[in-house]
Amino acid sequence: MADLKITLIKSAVHRLPKQRAIVKSLGLGRVSSSVVKPNNEATRGAIFHIAHLVNVEEVK
């Protein structure tokens, strides 16, 4: 299973507190910051809630 590269493309400022918490829990800080996370249900669930703020790519 491939990992996921998650890039924050929109700011979390002025978003719901739950969405800000998810962005922080994924390890994303500033706009254009990226992290590589395992492709599992927990990560997919977090991405579902902030899909409008991030860009997701599969990496090997």
UniProtKB/Swiss-Prot annotation:
Please provide, in alphabetical order, the Gene Ontology terms of the cellular component aspect for this entry. Answer: large ribosomal subunit
Among CDD domains, the record links this protein to: Ribosomal_L30 (cd01658)
List, alphabetically, the Gene3D superfamilies matched. Answer: Ribosomal protein L30, ferredoxin-like fold domain
Name the source's superkingdom.
Answer: Bacteria
Is Mitochondrion found in the keyword set? Answer: no
A GO BP entry is: translation
Entry keywords, A to Z:
Ribonucleoprotein, Ribosomal protein
| GO MF annotation: an example | structural constituent of ribosome
The UniProt entry, under Pfam families, shows: Ribosomal_L30
- Quaternary form? Part of the 50S ribosomal subunit.
The entry sums up its family as follows: Belongs to the universal ribosomal protein uL30 family.
Protein name, per record: Large ribosomal subunit protein uL30
Species of the source: Leuconostoc mesenteroides subsp. mesenteroides (strain ATCC 8293 / DSM 20343 / BCRC 11652 / CCM 1803 / JCM 6124 / NCDO 523 / NBRC 100496 / NCIMB 8023 / NCTC 12954 / NRRL B-1118 / 37Y)
